[in-house]
Amino acid sequence: GEITDYAGSSASDEGIVGSKVSRDLRKLKDNDDVKAVVLRVNSPGGSAFASEQIWHAVKELKTKKPVIVSMSDYAASGGYYISCAADTIVAEPTTLTGSIGIFGMVPNVKGLTDKIGLTYDVVKTNKYSDFGNIMRPFNEGEKALLQMTITEGYNTFIGRCAEGRHMTKEAIEKIAEGRVWTGEAA
């Protein structure tokens, strides 16, 4: 399912909640009866924050026991992010994986509010206090700020993949750029 920051934030009940999965992985790490962990991943991605939480938990878990990821239908974007730290990754030939990329979007309902005659006033402390305001388009400074954040996140994702798969960042960048791969091609 979708990787989310908290329960109930996914459109379905099958969401992968970052804090819950991380907590469960820590319990497995501390359980001496568990000798290895197979993590079945079936996710098209989701929250970068929750993916990072789970990535850290997988990395911590593998300091004490082997972690094997078994990819199902999807392990793309955040699904790949949480997988790449594993010791071993196994994919089905038809698994869709990769999609090493990040995007952000904020709706702009200005056209709608203009049509219905809705107006608003804003009082703020500085020029970015209402960053993400959906009642107007981004200004150039806000676009640059969002792009900087997205680029930082993408570079972190590339670094996590490189570290987890024991590859250089340059090698990861050649196969990244948001492209999706079948399990067979991967």
Regions found by a protein language model. Give the residues of each.
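Small-residue-centered hinge/linker elements
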Residues: 1-65, 74-80, 84-164
